Amino acid sequence: MSKLVLVLNCGSSSLKFAVVDAENGAEHLSGLAECLHLPEARIKWKLDGKHEAQLGNGAAHEEALAFMVETILASKPELSENLAAIGHRVVHGGEQFTQSALITDEVLKGIEDCATLAPLHNPAHIIGIKAAQKSFPALKNVAVFDTAFHQTMPEEAYLYALPYNLYKEHGIRRYGMHGTSHLFITREVASLLNKPVEEVNIINCHLGNGASVCAVKNGQSVDTSMGLTPLEGLVMGTRCGDIDPAIIFHLHDTLGYSVEKINTMLTKESGLAGLTEVTSDCRFVEDNYGQKEEATRAMDVFCHRLAKYVAGYTATLEGRLDAITFTGGIGENSAPIREMVLNRLGIFGIEVDSEANLKARFGGEGVITTANSRIPAMVISTNEELVIAEDTARLAGL
């Protein structure tokens, strides 16, 4: 039986897709539709070479999925005819979903109910699920939740020091994101160290335009930096991460900012973009560090925040840390950021191997600390699509 899984990741203005063989991990197709709802909506894909096409003025998720089915997959019948199931990345599953789920009307309703916790993402996921069901009515659909891996966090880690009824009645707590990536890295470290997953203790840094840290104890998430939403925690591309909540009142009451303006500023105009006042692109920050004041400022704040989180999470692991790991677009490719962060953690006996660190870029992986380092640090490429494909195959009975 075929184990080809169509993996869909619908963002607020994008649709990422791939066809993955859940049995051997081979990726037969990958692509991205971006700038959806805008005049420049376009789609790029890799299938027997690289391709790109315009989707038309204001094209939405439905049009992008239709193009993928009717144009891209139609050009490769051996793929479309052998698709066995569809897996969907879903950002927020709240407390209702502690693991991946076969999509039923009840599960779809649950995803809709969680939309208040991820208003930019969950509605887009629902559109993608319904469009996929329409395009492939015979295939089973599976939801794989970013929040599920973090449902093992203890109460002391996920509760906020707010009136307890806000949690009991409204579910206001830490949920965390990037769970699928953190899970994949945990499994990879177990394999590299030749240990059962249940014995792995790591601190994983998933660094991209969105970024989070996760403390993993005995193979389970015990703390993570993102909170109720993906806004909390690290400095990100355009998101502020941790701030004094009273800043919001000051912006509103003293400076006259509207709630909408504050929300836009914290989510789309802060982070690296806010600190540089130029760009959210980490490559600019890295290339101009020490030369341009704005780049130096942004990189120092980014690395300070990340090192502080990593150091703090050692306390949750109670004495044993097998590895510090870096993944995601920045984590996998930015040798300077990795070195700056690890050098700030010298108190733990960490020694960076600068040559190995420099080699571990652009698909390179491996240990980036010296043999004398008390704690190893590793670069590992994440593969969320594979985790989604594997869970989908399992739940779809492939």
From Swiss-Prot:
Homodimer. The active site is at residue 146. The gene is ackA1. Its cofactor is Mg(2+); Mn(2+). Substrate binds at residue 89. GO terms for molecular function: acetate kinase activity; ATP binding; magnesium ion binding. It comes from Vibrio vulnificus (strain YJ016). This is Acetate kinase 1. GO terms for biological process: acetate metabolic process; acetyl-CoA biosynthetic process.
